[in-house]
Swiss-Prot record:
It comes from the Bacteria. InterPro entries: Restrct_endonuc-II-like (IPR011335), tRNA_endonuc-like_dom_sf (IPR011856), UPF0102_YraN-like (IPR003509). NCBIfam families: PRK12497.1-3 (NF009150), YraN family protein (TIGR00252). Signal peptide: none annotated. This is UPF0102 protein Mpe_A3766. It comes from Methylibium petroleiphilum (strain ATCC BAA-1232 / LMG 22953 / PM1). Belongs to the UPF0102 family. GO terms for molecular function: nucleic acid binding. Pfam families: UPF0102.
Length: 122
């Protein structure tokens, strides 16, 4: 039996290969921020650099089928907030943070959809 984690890890591998072929460069993988007493931590699946220098924070969602609205529909507002929180933490390492965006790679079976600027930090 394949675990959910194994499916997710496989999806991240496929998404990374797809984005590298598109010309992005891997900066970091599975960047995690610890939570606090009232705040859950966050994780960014992939951090990449686009050709124009933009830092790209990528959430990867993998589903076997398109049922229940598909993979992209599972990136809820709460999940977006956690990703943004982790990205803000990540950006603190820069004296002058580069431009950034939040992408989603949705994998449904064999189909891969790359949603550039899927959400913003507001």
């Amino acid at each position: 039996m394949v675990t959910t984690k194994a499916v997710g890890d496989g999806g991240e591998d496929r998404a990374l290969a797809y984005l590298l072929r598109a010309g992005l460069k891997l900066v970091e993988r599975n960047y995690r921020v610890a939570g606090g007493p009232r705040v859950r931590g966050g994780e960014i699946d992939l951090v990449l650099r686009d050709r124009d220098g933009t830092l790209v924070f990528v959430e990867v969602r993998t589903r076997a089928t398109r049922s229940h609205g598909g993979a992209a529909a599972t990136v809820s507002g709460v999940k977006q907030q956690r990703i943004v929180r982790a990205a803000r933490h990540y950006l603190m390492r820069f004296a002058s943070p580069p431009p950034c965006r939040f992408d989603v790679v949705a994998i449904e079976g064999e189909h891969i959809a790359w949603l550039r600027a899927a959400f913003d930090a507001s």
